[in-house]
Every structure is written in structure tokens, then in C-alpha cells.
Regions:
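Ser/Thr-glycine-rich phosphate-binding loops at phosphate-binding pockets of nucleotides
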Residues: 31-35, 177-181, 195
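C-terminal helicase lobe and adjacent C-terminal extensions/tails of nucleic-acid helicase motors
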Residues: 40, 99-169, 190, 194-256
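Conserved two-lobed SF2 helicase motor
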Residues: 167-183
Length: 256
């Protein structure tokens, strides 16, 4: 529910801001990896002071640039990346996470685990540290002091950054446990992803950290695979963040 209310008001503020910027002819650039057509239509319309809606073209390719000078609207399509991955989705019980990680890392690998609350991330991190898994382990969440968070994010980039970056020192085995901070802004690459259920747009953001770069993968992790955590407790704390209806609706749309 908190997430739904936040998004509702944020969208209203964004549209009003765009209408003001459009009125003063201020150039604006909006970037998104998961922008539905209807949402893009509302944003462009707000900038054009509620001008006529864009005609949908669902067959058009992505990625795409939509441009307006307030007089007309143009779209420019770009060729897709040659790297096309099909991600396998599976469920994993919360009680089986440590065992699954240990099994999947039999030949090495870098695993990302994204949880929806700080307390759950801390708890799982402690369980992994107490297990017999041999790997570098890092914990990242929003409640660290800014200086500590910057330091940890720098470590994560160094471990999981682009192969072309000379600063990247990818280890043979590592596990990064974190919250939503891992789905935003960090250009990092996991061999395997385990995540709490979240709204589909955010789930896609998380999956975007899986097999992100071209590199040789450990045996058994050659193909991108994402485990969605199946929780048995009735009071799922994720529902307090995203809302029960939204999570259940999006869970039904995820094909496993």
C-alpha cells in the first residue's frame, strides 16, 4: 500500500512539474527501462500541456526515443542489443535459500539476493555468514551511514562491474545481499539472482542485474536464472510496502 500511494502522488507531481517545464519550454530528458506506453503518453501529454494523445504503436521495436517540440511528436527506433537472454524463473522456499545458493555455487559464481526489507536482508546475511559457504559476502541497504554505503557500493562495483573496466576484480565466488538499492543505478552483473516478489516493473529492474555483461560464466550458471522467494507466512512484510493487490496481481502475471 505504501508503494502504491507513493507512486500515485509521485506521478501526479511529475506530471505537474512537466507541465510547468513545458510551459517555459525547458528541455527535459526522461530515461526508463520499464516505461509502459500509457505512462509515456501521460508524461508527453503533460509536457505538451495536455495535447492530443499519442497514437499507440505496440508493434514498434524497443529501445526507442520519443521526442516532442510541443508542435509534433516523433519516435526513433534503435536496433536491439545482440545479447538476447531468456531468463528462467523458478520459486525457492525461504527456508531453502542457503542450500540453493550453496548448490548453485558448486563451481563458483557471483550471486545477488534482493530482499524487500532491511531486517530480512540482515537476517539472511547472518544466516549465510554462519553457513559453510565459502565466498566473499557483502551486505548493502539504505540504513547504512552515507559514507559506509558509498564505500560498500564502491566495493560491489569493483567486484561485479564491467569486464572492460580495469578496476573490476571479479572474484571466483561472492554473494551480495541487499535491498532495493541493488535494483537502482548500480551497473553490476550477477551469475544468479534470488529475489523477493515485487511489482513487475521493479522485478525487471532486478533481473537487469542478471547476466548483464558478456563474460564467461561458471559451469551450471551458463544461462540466466532468477529464483523468486516463496514465503509461507501470512503476514508478508512486502505487502506493507507494495500492497497486497499489486503483488498478487503481478505474481499472477509472472510465468514460471
Amino acid at each position: 500500500m505504501k508503494y502504491m500511494l507513493m507512486m500515485r502522488f509521485m506521478n501526479q507531481y511529475l506530471e505537474r512539474t512537466l507541465s510547468w517545464l513545458g510551459a517555459y519550454e525547458v528541455p527535459v530528458v526522461l530515461l526508463s527501462a520499464t516505461l509502459p506506453f500509457e505512462r509515456k503518453n501521460r508524461l508527453v501529454s503533460a509536457y505538451m500541456n495536455n495535447a492530443e494523445a499519442i497514437q499507440p504503436d505496440y508493434a514498434a521495436a524497443l529501445p526507442r526515443i520519443t521526442y516532442t517540440d510541443k508542435q509534433s511528436i516523433e519516435t526513433i527506433n534503435f536496433p536491439k542489443s545482440e545479447q538476447q537472454n531468456t531468463v528462467k524463473l523458478s520459486y525457492v522456499s525461504e527456508t531453502d535459500i542457503v542450500e540453493t545458493v550453496n548448490k548453485k555455487m558448486a563451481n563458483g559464481g557471483c550471486v545477488g539476493i534482493i530482499l524487500n526489507t532491511v531486517s530480512r536482508a540482515q537476517q539472511l546475511y547472518r544466516l549465510l555468514r554462519a553457513s559453510d559457504i565459502s565466498a566473499d559476502m557483502l551486505l548493502i541497504h539504505s540504513e547504512f551511514l552515507p559514507s559506509d554505503r558509498i564505500r560498500i557500493e564502491s566495493q560491489i562495483r569493483e567486484l561485479l562491474g564491467k569486464p572492460s573496466d580495469k578496476r573490476t576484480r571479479r572474484p571466483e565466488r561472492c554473494i551480495v545481499v541487499g535491498t532495493q538499492v541493488l535494483e537502482q543505478s548500480l551497473d553490476i552483473d550477477f551469475d544468479l539472482l534470488i529475489t523477493d516478489m515485487s511489482p513487475v516493473d521493479l522485478l525487471l529492474q532486478r533481473i537487469g542485474r542478471l547476466h548483464r555483461h558478456n563474460r564467461v560464466r561458471p559451469s551450471g550458471l551458463d544461462n540466466p536464472e532468477c529464483y523468486i522467494i516463496s514465503r509461507g507466512d501470512e503476514k508478508d512484510t512486502s505487502e506493507l510496502i507494495y500492497g497486497r493487490y499489486l503483488l498478487k496481481a503481478d505474481k499472477g502475471s509472472v510465468e514460471l
